[in-house]
Swiss-Prot record:
Residues 1-27 form the signal peptide. It comes from Ictalurus punctatus. It comes from the Eukaryota. The gene is npy. This is Pro-neuropeptide Y. Keywords: Amidation, Cleavage on pair of basic residues, Neuropeptide, Secreted, Signal. One of its GO terms (molecular function) is neuropeptide hormone activity. SMART domains: PAH.
Amino acid sequence: MRPRANVCVGWAACILLVVCLCVLAEGYPTKPENPGEDAPVEELAKYYSALRHYINLITRQRYGKRSNTDVLTPDLLFGEAEIRLQSRYDDPLMG
């Protein structure tokens, strides 16, 4: 019975992975269709506008409010205040 249960869990994991990938792919913007070389000027203008929008979506930076990581790094590593490390051999009552 055990090997059959392991196979079922494996198949369920594969199906779940495929479903997750499909959901992720739906959220990705689609590339605009090329109207062709003989298209009117208005359609080419719409295509280039849609292509510019698509490229801006794909290549935008996703850093949030602060895009400069140099400012953020020291605060994360050291904090704003200097931390005094206390040895466990230092007795606060004796000093």
